[in-house]
Curated annotation (Swiss-Prot):
Belongs to the TACO1 family. Signal peptide: none annotated. GO terms for molecular function: DNA binding. Its main location: cytoplasm. GO terms for biological process: regulation of DNA-templated transcription. PANTHER family: TRANSCRIPTIONAL REGULATORY PROTEIN YEBC-RELATED, TRANSLATIONAL ACTIVATOR OF CYTOCHROME C OXIDASE 1. Keywords: Cytoplasm, DNA-binding, Transcription, Transcription regulation. The keyword Transcription regulation applies. It is found in: Cytoplasm. This is Probable transcriptional regulatory protein Paes_0496. The keyword RNA-binding does not apply.
Amino acid sequence: MSGHSKWSTIKRKKAATDQKRGNLFTKLVREITIAAKMGGGDPSGNPRLRLALDNARANSMPQENIQRAIKKGTGELDGVVYEEITYEGYGPGGIALIIETATDNRNRTVADIRHIINRSNGSLGENGSVSWMFHRKGCIDVLKSSAGEEELMEILLEAGLEDLNTDDEQFYNVIIDVKDLESAKKALDDKGIAYENARMDMIPDNYVELEAEDAVKAVKLIDALENSDDVQVVYSNIEFSEQAMNSLDS
């Protein structure tokens, strides 16, 4: 899982900038709205909404914004109707891309995504062209300062831990079955262990290692996609060589 850990590290470094752009709140609002639309506005019976609300609060979203997003999803307030569409394709160095969107205009969205990918000499593929390379998993970034590795493993093994990556300097990257994500969060909460960004990710079965030039191009491509208004999240099977990591850090 080292490739996933390295990419998670890079994405965390981008997070502060993304929040300044306002992108983060926009994505969170759309996720809350869609979750409420699909499963109702009561988080106790809607796990997806519960997770979206946890992430919104962790990022200091005002309660007023949260409630308005829920009510738009349930139809209690008028608002834009979003549909979820997933696109698949390839980027620099042959990396696979899964692009999840929430849009009110699919023609605009696919045109924007195709333009961004083509600009990087990538290509947009058919549905299923790369998704077979990935599996959806629950992921939690646990602060290393809040628990030792052995303690964390002991706590999470009972909650269904599948993998624990320790490569990052600040965080353990926990991989768990989606159905066990909430029980893992509860186990951490019960022990007072601090974590960030509990989420569902698409984890690749295998990684494509990129050298410096392609790595820089790939990160710029993913950054451009994630800054597109309709894109919620981008998954890839990037692995970075040591030289590439140094180039990205510089």
